[in-house]
Amino acid sequence: MDEEKRKIAVQAYYGMCSFMDSNVGKLLTELKQCDIYDDTTIIYASDHGESLGNRGLWGKMTMYEDSASIPLIIKGPNFKKNQMCKTPVTLIDLYPTIFDILSLDHVASEANIDGESLRAIANKTYDKNRCVLSEYHGAGSYGGAFMLRMGDYKYIYYVGHQPEVFDIKSDPNEKRNLANDPSFRSLVDMLDNALRSIINPESVDEAARSDQKKMLKDVGGIDFVLNRG
């Protein structure tokens, strides 16, 4: 992509952000006019970020902060004002959060669902040992992508490749891969063990690829899909 097209793409993205911001503002104004703003809990989030040309990448599909990090803002009577929570959290935490706010009980089949109420997390001190997981298995990708956040550290593992480890606090742009530094060997091993205590990357990747192959076969094969566009 040449520089002129890149500028147009960035402008379009920022324009969409402004459009979203404007519409959120309209919603908040309406809530205030209806005199229900103070009693309303609002959760603002996104499903993924945007690489926006950084590292020569566009879209999502990676575990770098540009793609994997999202806004998560909660306003409501159950949450303190002007507070930033540094403990790593994930969208999986939204389900128990909503149930907690509404004082609802989980149905039996979902009693052991992952996640923790963000209200509880926000009211606790910074938990540097809390782990959150993200994974990606896009059809056609070279392998499954797995990411573990624990405190300030991020561990990225693409199946079949060497891991990447970043200290997000001191290296927010993720330029220094600590996995390449022998002095961080114990940290890398600890994060790898933490990831594998949650999930088996190789077996999950194999299962995802098997399902994708079956789906392709069911619709006529990869050539049929590519020719259809």
What is the meaning of each model-derived region?
Residues 1-40, 101, 197:
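A long, amphipathic alpha-helix that forms part
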